[in-house]
Regions:
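Extracytoplasmic beta-strand/coil segments of soluble accessory domains associated
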Residues: 68, 72-110
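Short strand-turn segments of transmembrane beta-barrel domains in outer membranes
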Residues: 158-187
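Periplasmic-side early beta-strands and strand-to-turn transitions of outer-membrane beta-barrels
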Residues: 155, 163-164, 184-276
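A beta-strand signature from Gram-negative outer-membrane beta-barrel systems
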Residues: 125-168
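Face-selective signature of the C-terminal outer-membrane beta-barrel domain
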Residues: 229-244, 272-391
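Structural signature of outer-membrane beta-barrel domains
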Residues: 42, 111, 174-176, 201-205, ...
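N-terminal periplasmic "start-of-domain" segments of outer-membrane beta-barrel proteins
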Residues: 32-65, 93
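Short acidic/polar hinge/loop motifs at secondary-structure boundaries
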Residues: 93, 110-138
Length: 391
């Protein structure tokens, strides 16, 4: 017990030191209002208002293709999807209680971007065969995650393999030149377990009786999750997901045809073909220690990056480009004193960066937002529908 506390304090002071180092380096820091963060990896409020869960058994029997198919069928969820699955501008927006501000957590790590449509995670890139559970918390239940989860929380847990090896392959074809191949491989041997998936999707021109719309999409995404277990009490997990897409589509912009800068602009709509690309990668390393059935500690580091661009543009000197990166660290400790009383504490630090941004009107680079949290949360379940939270 003493060793555990010393380890927790050491990590705590290490993070505080790193905060001072970042400030000394001259990076722009934004201190937000105090926020409440929960360390509960699995919520015990199943069946209560504002909480919906699809477990592994339901996922296997539901004939789902991806995580988007699962989420859009949950009660109380309004979903607005834009673009083809995995497309250049594809995203899936969740509305809970009328708010579009939500947080996506995959295997304990926040996975959507802060700001713009990049905050709207594309769930269609996660194959259903990789999912162990999908949970949705409405705004009331998700408020413990802070202002970023005003609309709610979507919490996804991916599979850890059981004993043996299992491989599945799925091939699909359809209209508009659509082809899709999926492979999923799960295995466990002794203290090691792994899960691997890969998907490739191709789609061609859209056409109807009236017109044909030139377009092309070639998307590949894959992921691996490798876990080393130490008995029944601890495990170390490395997760890596990668996405790559190439696109051709018809888009438009507005060009100013007024040569005199002192006069109001005369905007003319231009429609043209463009090539586009998008790449993403997510890397996470987590260590989880279970001291007892009611006490656990999770420490992790993560990094996400995304690069999207139009390769061909009317203005070659200023193509549209967006390059983002997030790096973070968290340490969460939770102790359940009895079924209706849980104490949680920890630290979290993450840095969002705009490495490069360009469009026809502006150019921007090296923008950084640093978020830090040191929290202690005391939760009392007073009744089935009444919860008291102190922080």
């Amino acid at each position: 017990m003493q060793q555990k506390k010393l380890c927790f304090l050491a990590i705590f002071y290490l993070v505080l030191f790193s905060m001072k180092t970042a400030a000394a380096a001259g990076e722009a820091e934004f201190y937000l209002e105090p926020m409440i963060v929960t360390a509960a990896r699995y919520d015990n409020s199943a069946g209560k208002p504002g909480y919906y869960k699809v477990d592994e058994k339901k996922l296997e029997n539901g004939n789902y293709d991806n995580a988007l198919d699962v989420i859009k069928q949950l009660p109380g969820v309004t979903l607005m999807a834009r673009g083809a699955s995995g497309g250049m501008n594809a995203y899936s927006k969740i509305l809970l209680n009328g708010s579009d501000r939500y947080l996506v957590i995959i295997d304990g790590v926040r996975s959507n971007w802060n700001g713009s449509s990049y905050n709207d995670f594309d769930f269609s890139v996660l194959p259903a065969g990789m999912l162990e559970s999908v949970e949705v918390l409405s705004s009331a239940a998700g408020s413990v995650y802070g202002n970023a989860a005003k609309g709610g929380v979507i919490r996804i847990t991916t599979k850890k393999a059981v004993e043996g090896v299992k491989t599945s392959i799925n091939l699909e074809t359809g209209s508009y030149g659509r082809e899709q191949e999926n492979i999923l491989h799960l295995g466990k041997s002794g203290e090691w377990s792994w899960s691997v998936y890969a998907r490739k999707s191709i789609m061609g021109d859209y056409s109807s009786a009236r017109q044909s719309i030139p377009s092309y999409e070639n998307v590949e995404n894959a992921g691996i999750k490798l876990t080393k277990a130490w008995g029944e009490t601890a495990d170390l997990t490395l997760s890596y997901r990668v996405f790559s897409g190439r696109y051709k589509s018809k888009i438009f912009n507005y060009k100013n045809t007024e040569p005199d800068e002192t006069k109001p602009p005369k905007l003319v709509k231009n429609i043209f073909m463009t090539d586009a690309r998008k790449t993403e990668d997510n890397l996470t390393l987590e260590y989880e220690r279970k001291f007892s059935d009611t006490e656990n500690n999770i420490v992790g580091i993560y990094r996400r990056s995304s690069n999207a661009a139009y390769d061909r543009s009317l203005n070659v000197e200023r193509p549209w480009l967006l390059d983002l990166r997030t790096e973070g660290f968290f340490d969460r400790y939770s102790k359940q004193w009895h079924p209706k009383h849980t104490l949680t504490g920890g630290v979290e630090y993450y840095k969002d960066q705009v490495l490069d941004y360009q469009d026809l009107a502006a150019k921007y680079s090296d923008g950084t937002v640093i978020s830090k949290a040191v929290y202690l949360q005391d939760v009392w379940q007073l009744a089935d529908s009444v919860k008291a939270v102190g922080s």
